[in-house]
From Swiss-Prot:
Domain comment in the entry: The NAC domain includes a DNA binding domain and a dimerization domain.
UniProt cross-references to Pfam families, sorted A to Z: NAM
Biased composition (Acidic residues): 229-244
Name listed for the protein in its UniProt record: NAC domain-containing protein 23
Protein's job: Transcription factor involved in the regulation of seed size. Possesses transactivation activity in yeast.
Region annotated Disordered, chain positions: 225-252
Keyword hit for Nucleus: yes
Compartments where found: Nucleus; Cytoplasm
Amino acid sequence: MAMTPQLAFSRMPPGFRFQPTDEQLVVDYLQRRTAAQPCVTPDITDIDVYNVDPWQLPAMAMYGSDHDRYFFTMAAREAQARRTTPSGFWKPTGTKKTIFVVAGGHEVPTAVKRRFVFYLGHHQPSGSSNNNKTSWIMHEYRLMNSPRAAVPSSSSVNRLPTDDLTEEMVLCRISNKDLPKPPFIHNGLLQFSSVGLNGDGYNYLILDHLEPPAMEYPNVDIGNVDDAAAADDDPGDLDEEIDDSMQRNHGG
């Protein structure tokens, strides 16, 4: 029987908050998950993150802080990776960060962390797109020497295929810096008619149609998605610095 988010949280002690550092995510979760070893917490949800719109994800997560949710997913190897969802796509911003893990008294480069911003609309050739940036952020963690991911017998909500050597297991941290006001209902950007339930009982939105978005970032030319994403490089790096600083202050 699949564990629901409500059941998962009910098994945690009072005051429990899931706020792992980058190193903990890599060592205690991603490495152990790819080796089919039990993680510290019972489950981080397995789900096809790149086939689901980000606003559907929070209700599917087992663990997370007030603004972060964590998922395991299978992703194409970096050179072939496409991160397109039904309503938009994830665009990389900033620079990749190497995560070092202490082993044998030495810091060993073990994983790569990359930041993405979600854009509404479909990816088009440069100069011909009509996309709009949202406040949904994803940090993707990949092992530098990733083995083929094994599926433990107690795998969580959704089992993912693992026999394709062109794919690898990654860990994703999804957040929305504008919560609790989701961007998909801001200014009537998306219209929806009802709330439904998927097979596991999680809420999701049934979207009727996507209206042309209002411009929320007047200083960015969203007619060119590559330029718009490039304009995020410096803010993305700043977000990484703030994130790293907070982890150090909490002992990460």
